[in-house]
Amino acid sequence: MSILDRKEIFRVEESSLTFEKLVNEAAPEISSGLREKSVVILPSHGHDDVFYAGTLDTLDFLNENGINTDVYASDEEYKELSLHGAEFWLGIFIIQSIVVPVFCGVISSYIYDKLKAKDDDNIALKFMVENKEGKTTAIEFHGKVENLSKAIDAVKSLSDED
């Protein structure tokens, strides 16, 4: 099995991370900007302060499409990690459940229309959805874009809308 044919990962599990915890643990220059956000892009790849290359493009796309989003870093601390390979690395997103329906449409548009991802491309991402009671569920996906809909559907199922 080559690195390009690795096994798909699709995981849904509880998480202890919440928006309140992020705001309370952040430096003041970061926490003040997070309070009104619906989505926060978190550092990725096991680093406290490193984001995947393209994170700012993702941030801009979400904001331009009505999703109030920020990154969990100050401008001075923000660093990107470029991973070269045949894979799209989007990162980790914590999402308030109230915006899930809109977020799912916008992030799908970003993946298919902006990144031009094809069905046989690989993609890696993690969505963490916090419901109105403050409970967070994490959905992690690493696999072919053609199978991404199961992760998007899992996120949609966590929406506060009935």
Q: Can you annotate each of these PLM segments?
A:
Residues S2-S74, N131-K132, A138-I139, V145-L148:
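Membrane-active, amphipathic/fusogenic segments and juxtamembrane/transmembrane anchors
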Residues E76-K126:
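Membrane-inserting effector segments that mediate pore formation, membrane fusion
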